[in-house]
Amino acid sequence: IGKATTALKEGNMEQAEKVRIADEEIDQAETDIERLCLRLLLQQQPVARDLRQISAALKMITDMERIGDQASDIAEIIITEDKSEAQDISMKLSEPASKMVRDSVNAYVEKDLDLARKVMENDDVVDELFEEVKTTLINFIAENKGLQGVEAIDLIMVAKYLERIADHATNIAERVEFS
């Protein structure tokens, strides 16, 4: 996520391409982890807490893979668009979404219910921020501030991808209670 948003901020095409390539590695890691979890289920036949942990891990890796997909989608937009001032607007979601991912993973690893709850609370903040960013970008077009329709749509999509990343972080945080 950080590499994708840095690439967007700096207009760094090389960094954006690295993000797209890294998504393939994330996809492979998801497959490998899923295979390990299924092997544990078959060979160990876990019950109770162990079963909940494996189930949570299976769901969590799906969210992590989707976060990688969203970062890759941001990178694809960076590669096709020139850097503009309007990009800063869509980047308002970058830090909150990235922090939510870090915090949700930390909450899962540390079994920190308080941190998980904070992540879940922050989801509403990011949702509101997305609506604000969307409205601002639409106003940029309406006020002829040099933002073309296609670029505005791409930047709204970047903001939406970041909002979806926050949603996936929330899903991970919700699994802390379950596991």
Q: Model-flagged regions — what are they?
A:
Residues 1-179:
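Cytosolic, long alpha-helical scaffolding segments
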